[in-house]
């Protein structure tokens, strides 16, 4: 049986997973660093890298035990090798390459974004091509996923990522870190129409997005309010989340038009939303409705596979393993690595 070991360390989650050739997840362990970074209100790169270094060996041992797997049973080792916080990326990549060398097993360098892009093929086994909205704390882009290693970026944020906007607004409201889930929780209790926020470049006619102006508008409102109580916080969270939904819905329509100009596959019309923001149930509902209007089905991974995890890295490794796309051990990890720059 083919077993793929996946390692993810691009930000603040130390993750290790083992999956089989049949897309079965035997074990998927994530060691969160939230408590280590919460006091700073965001991720501190050096702390993250040191934490990966101390957690990876433990995570690997736990995955092997949970999956009843020996190291010698592993067919190949896939590790995030960019983009991300370079310290953590180097730690995970070096750990994987050391295992590869010691075990004489192939190494596969995985683009973290490709891991997110292919998650729906792990969970739903959907065919190529499909339209992807990658929405996380570090990235926000529409991508035509045409095949393995074949990606066309249709548009992206010109400033902040949408997940970053969630986290920064949460910090303005003195909510806990990470901010995305806290905003969603508070938004359920608030009035989404209480405050009217701007929707930058919503009528640009292309797939690019902007969230910096929205974030600034929230900050300005907070500074001008005489009192900030729970009701106000809930209303701001709800209004902010509503505005994000409006922006993304509009841009999904632009992305569908752009996507249909470069693909002729109209019998399987799938839109995938991946990345941490994909876990937001409000946005799932809004974007599902938008997709349905255009005859598309919106697919999103289960919550535990929306945020950073190693199962998605292992699966990307499986697709590359099946195509004999291995990576030399002298591969250099990358802090920046566009999906369009992936080579097969």
Swiss-Prot record:
Q: Answer yes or no on keyword Transferase.
A: yes
User: Which Pfam families has this protein been placed in?
Assistant: TsaD (PF00814)
Question: What cofactors does the UniProt entry give for this protein?
Answer: Fe(2+)
Reaction(s) the record says it catalyses: L-threonylcarbamoyladenylate + adenosine(37) in tRNA = N(6)-L-threonylcarbamoyladenosine(37) in tRNA + AMP + H(+)
Which Gene Ontology cellular-component terms appear in the entry? cytoplasm
Instruction: Name where it mostly resides.
Output: cytoplasm
Give the molecular function GO annotations.
Answer: iron ion binding; N(6)-L-threonylcarbamoyladenine synthase activity
EC number(s) from the headed UniProt entry: 2.3.1.234
| Record key words, sorted | Acyltransferase, Cytoplasm, Iron, Metal-binding, Transferase, tRNA processing
Q: Where in the cell is it found?
A: Cytoplasm
What domain of life does the UniProt record list for this protein's source? Answer: Bacteria
Q: What is this protein called?
A: tRNA N6-adenosine threonylcarbamoyltransferase
Organism of origin = Rickettsia rickettsii (strain Sheila Smith)
